[in-house]
Amino acid sequence: MAGSSFGTIFRLTTWGESHGKGVGVVVDGVPAGLSLSEEDIQFYLDRRKPGQNRFTTKRKESDTVQILSGTFEGKTTGTPISMVVWNEDQHSKDYSDIASYYRPGHADYTFDAKYGFRDYRGGGRSSGRETIARVAAGAIALKMLSELGITVSAYTRSIGDVEIQSFDAVEIANNALNMPDAEAAEKASELLTKAMAEKNSVGGVVECVVHHMPAGVGDPVFEKLDANLAKALVSIGAVKGVEIGDGFSVCIATGLTNNDAFHVNADGSIVKLTNHAGGILGGISDGSDIVVRAGFKPTPSVAASQQTINKDGENIAIEIKGRHDPIVVARAVVVVECMTALVLADALLVGMSAKLDNVKKVWALDEK
């Protein structure tokens, strides 16, 4: 299977299935000397793990990470970092019926069409459990970015038709849906409760903001920073769309209302007076906050009756059994953070060779 690796220098390769023995990742290109512990990784995995509230799957997993290689005495060595999380609570018997039919909204049919085979137990590689590997790798990227003063923060912007109307960063950790607006979180909880009672599910939007990203990161044409962010986010299961900055609303704007005016401060620093572009111009960061949004579809595994076909080509009705999230948005917040961080870490390392001055700073002989 191709397509399990991501990145150029800061590069990860993920492996494992939802109902296999475990999920893991190998991360190449991490600079030597970065302080790193399993606790650093675990902090982010704990934000993603299931079974923490009534709006997540009841699957109980500790999601405890083990670092197998690439560190010594608490620091990265510059060699590949291998990590694993063992599966503990897979109920494969819940999926025995699925072997005979294709679930609407899932990758069952397309995997069969491509490979002539599929792991029907929880979706195999297309399961949301695959994101464990992304989060583990992203935690390293976030640690590296923090060394540069760069922060990446994501939160739930909307669930269904309920969108935040205010922003309080403290509130994000105070509700199960990771919304920075307490009133919106309460309304979204009511919407989800209603959907669950109707054996249904809901989608939503995660917004991610990057602070203190320097100008000049990213490459034009095929390696644009926004293009790579879009690819990274759309690669997350259930993401169906991405916006950068003002996104699709610029389509009804004018040039004058959409353009971000530049200004020179008294200290000589260059800033923009607005940020409709979302911190990226021409595929390169402009020094403003980078703002991206990922739109998630409703969870396709719903308990209500649905029409589909079996592998014999017969039309049938099904009611999906098993333990499923009524919404993936809240748990996906940390996944969006981590995928964003992976793109930025890679772009920063790639960009070090863009100027001769950068190369000289590292490799030029001391003339003294």
Task: Locate predicted features.
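Glycine-rich anion/phosphate-binding loop at the beta-strand->alpha-helix junction
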Residues: W15, K21, K199-V202, V206-N315
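Alpha-helical support elements that line or immediately flank enzyme active sites
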Residues: K21-G33, R129-I150, E223, A227-K231, ...
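Short acidic, glycine/tyrosine-flanked loop/strand segments centered on an H-E-D-like triad
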Residues: A99-G124, Q306-H324
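Glycine-rich, mobile lid/loop segments that gate access to catalytic sites or pores
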Residues: A113-V221
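N-terminal, positively charged regions that mediate nucleic acid binding
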Residues: M1-R59
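Internal helix-turn-beta structural module
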Residues: S301-K368
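Glycine-rich, N-terminal phosphate-binding loop and its surrounding beta-alpha-beta segment
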Residues: Y44-P104, D108
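A short glycine/serine-rich beta->alpha loop
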Residues: R11-T14, D119-E130, A215-D219, N275-I280, ...
